[in-house]
């Protein structure tokens, strides 16, 4: 076998019959498989040992040789080579066909490659191949030309003979008729009888004339066919063909079936054909030129690749190794076999029958029928069901052919090459492990023992607990006590990977240090649930074990959960307190007026109370029960930094140093909360809503090392759980309070609704108006009930606390629970005008329950569809972007894109751009950012983090030019500087990072949250697609529904208002031709936009528009934008439109991810004029390749090619990739492979999928070439330094928990006394 690490590219081509015979180890002659009595393979059959190798290691068929010492000997009795049975997986056989057959892929594919090559229509081709028509393969033009006059004379003689015979017969008949009539007259017969005789005579004469005419026509037909006879001409009429052969057989040859195709290909001159086609393309027009272009693609493919087109007609069929189409005995003595064996059997049977018929000299018609059946059986073997009805097995199931083995999700590519099962893995249910630290997970003992079995066995032998591996294995299986101690030792410092399906983004697999736990469930740290999207209602997770030292290092450094706190999509922390933890911290930091021990100022003879000299004193008071953690107090602090605004006031320029004292007016709970934050973090004196907590963790992630952030969130988690327990937040029926005012509110609105009903019955309102009015009324009612509910609930109500703290839920849910449900929609998405007046607390009536189910059912159906759709979108995105890898540090380009940081309000203040987080943040500055005075605020090449953006805004800079992947000049992949900061690490992206896949995951992962439905925008407006369908529409570059026209030029608008349509004319500023858009439906309303005077209003007559501006509501067609404004604008347009959909759902994704995908959509140019290059006009070429070729041609003094940028949808772009392996594993497998084989494509193995398929390390991350061959030689200093780096454990807050022993800790033993 060849080793994957020793080749750099993989080529695919057409196999000729020669190749097939070369691969083969022998010919399969019989259709037999195995002998059912002895169960041994039949000789010369489909499982023959002589051809494919022995079924038992080192043992021949007849048993003469039975040991490894006879290796390589070929037995003289049975002819079997003595070798390993494994060769039955790789040795191929072949079937010699008695008649050639065409390969169905090349004849039946769309477009038909054979048809294009030979210039035959697929219908005609089918007639020839399946013996329905003859085709002329060659004509001896010269001989025909020389003897034409002689032949013509012969033909004239023959025609004369026919005419003479006709005339003679007519003459005789006429005389007989005269005689008959005369006889009748003599007898005095009636006129009636005479007329009958005359009619009969004339009828007979007419028949004579017709018969002669038919004969003459036939001769004329034969002659004209013969004179015009040309190769590749079809003759469907068998009699005509027979006549031609009889008369003029020596002047031409004709045939039917694949043999004729073979002959045509043999006589085909590829170079001459290519030249003539190129000529047609240069001078032709219209359809002719198009057809020539398409044909040239196929012809040029054969010309350039040096493939022989003979490979499309087969004389031999390869037989794949028997182990790949096995036959196994089932327990009932029956056999189960692969469908391929049935298909091969049919081929062999028909082939053998055909050979016999030919030997017998059977009539041509019988032989042809057998050849047709042979052709059909080979077609079924290659691609069953492609032509005609598929061949079915027992139970009417179509048999799986060779093509079906490659195709689809269950095919070879996606099932076995891109997805494999791995050993050293296990799965189990997950439960929460609140005592774990962020980088730990609890692994059940039994599971760990099984996973680490080989390690434990080796260690047992090392420690002399066992003499050899076999006894060690027995010890492990019997679970002797020593085994557990050894397991503890082996497991220490050995990270494991946890994965939860579906793995939508890279945080779906993270590394943890295992802690052994009792029980059979994996324990998961609560803070990583967000990244895995896990909950504990029965979810399962898989555990994988990294084995090699490199794998462990990567797991520990790159994948450890405490190093993956930030989301790769937005760069914001994912490991945040949620649910209970939020409630706990919210409770802890609430300030309750007049709570126990509150600060009282001095009054009269009372001194001030509630003042404490240190947090410790306050905690002691709280323990004594004289102070509540939520009461306002004054406390002297020395270890907490004052808030920024007070710090300057108290400590001047030198700032606060640890130990400096200051007085804080706050609550004990808030002091305790601040003690969880890193030393030197400014005091936060706020109630901890979830948003505030998020902002703090965000800030920590920007300013502190990851390790500190990890420790802080862990402390917050522990405190959160501790105080959530103490807060007593629970939900009971008693907490769901129905507002007492509800009845009177509803009665009031019922009256209003009745009035509307009456108006409707009187005819004052039509049906739609009534519905609209009722919907308005009940919406108001619902809001008012909600208001009443708010006022009625006390602040300490648990339900309101849960909602207010941001832990979960929202006010609408509370209103549904206790107020009223309100209006619900029907399946069409319209409001049902009867509201649901009950709340869930009171219970719904039967009718209310029923109308409520509509919406619920639609919701469930939507979710299911959305999940599938979103998964498919992710798959296409991954496919289009999988080879975008960071290839170099800096491509040195000067280009970039301009992003807005803020806009100036009329009063001169700056309003920060709301989308700064996803546009400017984490980018590299392209040019120096200079303020009005000319000072450089931030230099070119700086990374824009939050501090830099704040500095730019403070200096009054409103927009900056940043580097972007859209303008990156790296030919394959992107450069680190254009990409900017990696969102997941907060540092500049590393070389080798697979940014394409990260981008695809970041866009695809929130896809499930996007709404499915296409929503209506107000009234009758055209449907505007939203949600997931809109994202797909953009990425597939489809023409949108409700397409809006855009201005082709900058100029003034003339708006003409018809009764159903608008007509818009733009008069260009530069005095060019006017641009007219007419027949624009009124349903698509005019666009509202900002005018030059700064006001926002609808487009109207006389307005001034910029080029590319949208004139109507709806969505612009990206292809139009490309045509009018060019590639840069369409890229920005697509990024903006995709972002609008995600922002509407509150999902934050950085622009750079969308840019990576959009860049891939515009990678190609279509050639308009090929100049002196080799490109074919109309072909799609990679932009980098196009520019390189043009530079080369110009350097040699030739004409460069002209091309036009083209926008491709992601599916099309991934199928147009240079890598045939990647395209074939994506979609349309057979079409891609057919094309690749004809073009003799070579795969350079640059992307990820290709390398996964052939089993190489992927060229990304640590698998990239520059990291692959590194030998490490540490210096003395490095050795010394290596041991001083603090590990996560060292500076973890150990005093509270004591040192981690690594032992399994039963949950009950955990004291929660000290919450930190």
Curated annotation (Swiss-Prot):
Gene3D superfamilies in the cross-refs: 1.10.132.30, 1.10.150.390, 1.10.1790.20, 1.10.40.90, 2.40.40.20, 2.40.50.100, RNA polymerase II, clamp domain, RNA polymerase Rpb1, domain 3
Catalyzed reactions: RNA(n) + a ribonucleoside 5'-triphosphate = RNA(n+1) + diphosphate
Binding site for Zn(2+) 2: 891, 968, 975, 978
Disulfide-bonded cysteines: none
One GO CC term on file: DNA-directed RNA polymerase complex
Family: Belongs to the RNA polymerase beta' chain family.
Protein name (Swiss-Prot/TrEMBL): DNA-directed RNA polymerase subunit beta'
Native source species: Mycobacterium tuberculosis (strain CDC 1551 / Oshkosh)
């Amino acid at each position: 076998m060849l080793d994957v690490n020793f080749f750099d590219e993989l080529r695919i081509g057409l196999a000729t019959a020669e190749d097939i015979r070369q691969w083969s180890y022998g010919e399969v002659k019989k259709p037999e498989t195995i002998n059912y009595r002895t169960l041994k393979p039949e000789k010369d059959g489909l499982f023959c040992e002589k051809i494919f190798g022995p079924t038992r290691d080192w043992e021949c068929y007849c048993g003469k040789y039975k040991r490894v010492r006879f290796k390589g000997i070929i037995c003289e009795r049975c002819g079997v080579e003595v070798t390993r049975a494994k060769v039955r997986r790789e040795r191929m056989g072949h079937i010699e066909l008695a008649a050639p057959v065409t390969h169905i892929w090349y004849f039946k594919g769309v477009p038909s490659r054979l048809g294009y090559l030979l210039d035959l229509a697929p219908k005609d081709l089918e007639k020839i191949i399946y013996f329905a028509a003859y085709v002329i393969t060659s004509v001896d033009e010269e001989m025909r030309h020389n003897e034409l006059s002689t032949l013509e004379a012969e033909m004239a003689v023959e025609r004369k003979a026919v005419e003479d015979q006709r005339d003679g017969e007519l003459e005789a008949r006429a005389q007989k008729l005269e005689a008959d009539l005369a006889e009748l007259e003599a007898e005095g017969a009636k006129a009636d009888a005479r007329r009958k005789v005359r009619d009969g005579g004339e009828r007979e004469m007419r028949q004579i004339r017709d018969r002669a005419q038919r004969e003459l026509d036939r001769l004329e037909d034969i002659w004209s066919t013969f004179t015009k006879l040309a190769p590749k001409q079809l003759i469907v009429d068998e009699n005509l063909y027979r006549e031609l052969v009889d008369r003029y057989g020596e002047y031409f040859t004709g045939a039917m079936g694949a043999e004729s195709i073979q002959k045509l290909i043999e006589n085909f001159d590829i170079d001459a054909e290519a030249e003539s086609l190129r000529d047609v393309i240069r001078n032709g027009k219209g359809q002719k030129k198009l057809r020539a272009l398409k044909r040239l693609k196929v012809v040029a493919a054969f010309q350039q690749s040096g493939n022989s087109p003979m490979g499309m007609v087969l004389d031999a069929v390869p037989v794949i190794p028997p182990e790949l189409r096995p036959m196994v005995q089932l327990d009932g003595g029956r056999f189960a076999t692969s469908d391929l064996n049935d298909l091969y059997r049919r081929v062999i049977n028909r082939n053998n029958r055909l050979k016999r018929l030919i030997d017998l000299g059977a009539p041509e018609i019988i032989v042809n029928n057998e050849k047709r059946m042979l052709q059909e059986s080979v077609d079924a073997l290659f691609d069953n069901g492609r032509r005609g009805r598929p061949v079915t097995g027992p139970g009417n199931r179509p048999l799986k052919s060779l093509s079906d083995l490659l195709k689809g999700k269950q095919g070879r590519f996606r099932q076995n090459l891109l997805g494999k099962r791995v050993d050293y893995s296990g799965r189990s249910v997950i439960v929460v492990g609140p005592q774990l630290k962020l980088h730990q997970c609890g692994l059940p003992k039994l599971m760990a023992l099984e996973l680490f079995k080989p390690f434990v066995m080796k260690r047992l032998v090392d420690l002399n607990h066992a003499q050899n591996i076999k006894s060690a294995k027995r010890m492990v299986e019997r679970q002797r006590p020593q085994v557990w101690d050894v397991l503890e030792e082996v497991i220490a410092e050995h990270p494991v990977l946890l994965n939860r399906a579906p793995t939508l983004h890279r945080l779906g697999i993270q590394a943890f240090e295992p802690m052994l736990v009792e029980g059979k469930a994996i324990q998961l740290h609560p803070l990583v649930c967000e990244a895995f999207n896990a909950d504990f209602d029965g979810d399962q997770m898989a555990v994988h074990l990294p084995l090699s030292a490199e794998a462990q290092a990567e797991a520990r450094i790159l994948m450890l959960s405490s190093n993956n706190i930030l989301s790769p999509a937005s760069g914001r922390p994912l490991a945040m307190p949620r649910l209970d933890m939020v409630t706990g911290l919210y409770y802890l930091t609430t300030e309750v007026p007049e709570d126990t021990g509150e600060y009282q100022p001095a009054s009269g003879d009372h001194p001030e109370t509630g003042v404490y000299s240190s947090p410790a004193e306050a905690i002691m008071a709280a323990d004594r029960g004289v102070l509540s953690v939520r009461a306002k107090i004054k406390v002297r602090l020395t270890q907490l930094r004052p808030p920024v605004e007070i710090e300057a006031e108290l400590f001047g320029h030198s700032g606060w140093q640890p130990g400096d004292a200051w007085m804080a007016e706050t609550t004990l709970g808030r002091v305790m909360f601040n003690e969880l934050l890193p030393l030197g973090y400014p005091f936060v004196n706020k109630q901890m809503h979830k948003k505030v907590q998020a902002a703090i963790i965000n800030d920590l992630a920007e300013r502190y090392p990851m390790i500190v952030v990890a420790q802080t969130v862990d402390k917050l988690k522990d405190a959160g759980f501790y105080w959530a327990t103490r807060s007593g937040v629970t939900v009971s029926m008693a907490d769901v309070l129905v507002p007492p005012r509800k009845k009177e509110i509803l009665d009031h609105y019922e009256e209003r609704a009745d009035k509307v009903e009456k108006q409707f019955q009187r005819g004052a309102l039509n049906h739609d108006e009534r519905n609209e009015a009722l919907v308005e009324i009940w919406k108001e009612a619902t809001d008012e009930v909600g208001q009443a509910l708010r006022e009625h609930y006390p602040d300490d109500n648990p339900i309101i606390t849960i909602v207010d703290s941001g832990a979960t839920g929202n006010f609408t849910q509370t209103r549904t629970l206790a107020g009223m449900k309100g209006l619900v929609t029907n399946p069409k998405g319209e409001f049902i005008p009867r509201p649901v007046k009950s709340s869930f607390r009171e219970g719904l009536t039967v009718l209310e329950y029923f109308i409520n189910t509509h919406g619920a059912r639609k919701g469930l159906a939507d979710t299911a569809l959305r999940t599938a759709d979103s998964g498919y979108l992710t798959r296409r995105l991954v496919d289009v972007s999988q080879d975008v890898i960071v290839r170099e540090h800096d491509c040195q380009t000067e280009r970039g894109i301009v992003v807005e940081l803020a806009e100036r309000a009329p009063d001169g203040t700056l309003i920060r751009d709301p989308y700064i987080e996803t546009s400017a943040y984490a980018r590299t500055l392209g040019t120096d950012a200079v303020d009005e005075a000319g000072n450089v605020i931030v230099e070119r090449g700086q990374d824009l983090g939050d501090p830099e953006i704040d500095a730019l805004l403070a200096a009054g800079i409103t927009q900056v030019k940043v580097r972007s992947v859209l303008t990156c000049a790296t030919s394959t992949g992107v450069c680190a500087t254009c990409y900017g900061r990696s969102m997941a690490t907060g540092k500049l992206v590393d070389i080798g990072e697979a940014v394409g896949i990260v981008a695809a995951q970041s866009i695809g992962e929130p896809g499930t949250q996007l709404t499915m439905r296409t929503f209506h925008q107000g009234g009758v407006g055209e449907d505007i697609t939203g949600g997931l369908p809109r994202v797909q529409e953009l990425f597939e570059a489809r023409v949108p529904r409700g397409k809006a026209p855009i201005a082709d030029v900058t100029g003034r608008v003339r708006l003409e208002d018809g009764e159903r349509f608008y007509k818009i004319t733009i008069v260009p500023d530069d005095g060019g031709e006017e641009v007219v858009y007419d027949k624009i439906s009124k349903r698509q309303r005019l666009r509202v936009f900002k005018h030059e005077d700064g006001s926002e209003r609808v487009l109207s007559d006389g307005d001034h528009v910029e080029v590319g501006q949208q004139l109507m509501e709806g969505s612009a067609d990206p292809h139009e934008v490309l045509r009018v404004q060019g590639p840069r604008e369409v890229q920005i347009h697509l990024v903006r439109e995709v972002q609008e959909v995600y922002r509407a759902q509150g999902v934050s994704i950085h622009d750079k991810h969308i840019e990576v995908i959009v860049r891939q959509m515009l990678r190609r140019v279509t050639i308009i004029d090929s100049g002196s290059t080799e490109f074919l006009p109309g072909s799609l070429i990679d932009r980098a390749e196009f520019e390189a070729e043009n530079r080369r041609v110009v350097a040699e003094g030739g004409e460069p090619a002209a091309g036009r940028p083209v926008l491709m949808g992601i599916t099309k772009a991934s199928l147009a990739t240079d890598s045939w392996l990647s395209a074939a594993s994506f979609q349309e497998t057979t079409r891609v492979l057919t094309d690749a084989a004809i073009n003799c494509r070579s795969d350079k193995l640059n992307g990820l999928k290709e390398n996964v398929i052939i089993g190489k390390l992927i060229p990304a991350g640590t698998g990239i070439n520059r990291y692959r061959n590194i030998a490490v030689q540490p210096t003395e200093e490095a050795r010394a330094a290596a041991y001083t780096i603090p590990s996560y454990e060292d500076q973890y807050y150990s005093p509270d928990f004591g040192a981690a022993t690594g032992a399994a800790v039963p949950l009950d033993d955990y004291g929660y006394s000290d919450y930190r």
